């Protein structure tokens, strides 16, 4: 469910130290999950470790519970990590839940898994240390938490809501949009986001749907004609959505005012959060600040040396950005525009 922590806020931790005092992550990041009690680093090879929630130093060694890259992940409830793993060459996919109160473990290596596949024993191997690990018959595409449960979708199979005990709450058939029927993979989902009592789903071709979180029924749906593919989506509250698009573009949509604006960027957006009606965005060697007063114009742009991977809002202390090397720096644009 959307909250202040959806914007990677660290208000309750009282952090005001400089990024100069923050250690590099032990390996280059693919994702960084931040919750009230946990900060989980997921690296580009599927390695995972916990970071200290205030100092951001590694408190565990890097482990590999999944045999490859973690494709989707989310922290669920107070203590649980849920992730997916896909190996297309082997036609394997897993969905697993880890208890973050327990040490993260390393599991089977890819070379050994290939041997198991050749021997017809791939089903004997699951995610190491998992409370549960399930075989999926289709590629998992997106995942989110909703009211303490797990919501995920798989390719052309549908959307599912399950509890942390893995019991099914509901499932629904795949979403579709008539206008996207002629667009290859136009209806393939790329993002699920929980907002209040709803779950929002976004597709590669610009389709969007608001689902009733308790039943999975469609509340409303539509299509954005971006003339670009949707790569990622962030929610900023009060109906504000930011889209990372192909063709070096991004879009700001307000679903309440039914207004939309598109801007050019230097490359893919990696992360974004909204504070005081202003988007703070990092990505391809640039940080951007896009305020409500600039809705129909270009955002402020600052150049950074590396690719920004994650933004952390430290409130009065400004913003930290974790780059693709695993190093921290300040958001390059200072202050909040009016």
Question: What do these predicted regions represent?
Answer:
Residues 24-36, 64-79, 129-131, 135-147, ...:
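Repeated scaffold domains used in trafficking and secretory/extracellular systems
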């Amino acid at each position: 469910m959307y909250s202040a922590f959806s914007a990677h806020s660290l208000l309750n931790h009282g952090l005001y130290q400089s990024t100069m005092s923050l250690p590099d992550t032990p390996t280059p990041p693919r994702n960084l999950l931040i919750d009230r009690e946990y900060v989980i680093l997921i690296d580009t090879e599927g390695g995972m470790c916990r970071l200290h929630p205030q100092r951001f130093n590694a408190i565990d060694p890097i482990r590999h519970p999944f045999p490859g890259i973690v494709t989707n992940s989310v922290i669920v409830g107070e203590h649980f990590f849920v992730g997916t793993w896909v190996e297309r060459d082997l036609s394997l996919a897993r969905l697993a839940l880890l208890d973050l109160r327990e040490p993260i473990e390393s599991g089977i290596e890819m070379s050994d898994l290939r041997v198991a596949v050749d021997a017809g024993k791939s089903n004997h191997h699951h995610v190491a240390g998992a409370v549960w690990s399930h075989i999926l018959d289709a590629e998992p595409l997106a995942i989110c938490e909703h009211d303490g449960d797990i919501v995920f979708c798989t390719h052309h199979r549908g959307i599912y809501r399950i509890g942390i005990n893995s019991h099914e709450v509901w499932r629904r058939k795949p979403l579709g949009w008539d206008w996207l029927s002629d667009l290859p993979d136009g209806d393939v989902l790329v993002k699920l986001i929980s907002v209040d009592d709803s779950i929002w789903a976004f597709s590669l071709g610009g389709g969007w749907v608001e689902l009733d979180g308790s039943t999975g029924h469609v509340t409303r749906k539509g299509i954005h004609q971006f003339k670009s593919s949707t790569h990622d989506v962030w929610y900023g509250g009060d109906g504000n959505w930011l889209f990372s698009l192909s063709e070096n573009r991004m879009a700001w949509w307000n679903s309440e005012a039914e207004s939309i604006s598109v801007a050019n960027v230097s490359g893919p957006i990696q992360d974004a959060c909204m504070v005081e009606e202003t988007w703070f965005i990092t990505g391809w060697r640039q940080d951007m600040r896009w305020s409500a007063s600039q809705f129909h114009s270009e955002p402020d742009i600052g150049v950074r040396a590396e690719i920004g991977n994650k933004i952390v809002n430290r409130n009065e202390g400004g913003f930290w950005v974790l780059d693709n090397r695993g190093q921290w720096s300040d958001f390059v644009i200072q202050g909040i525009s009016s």
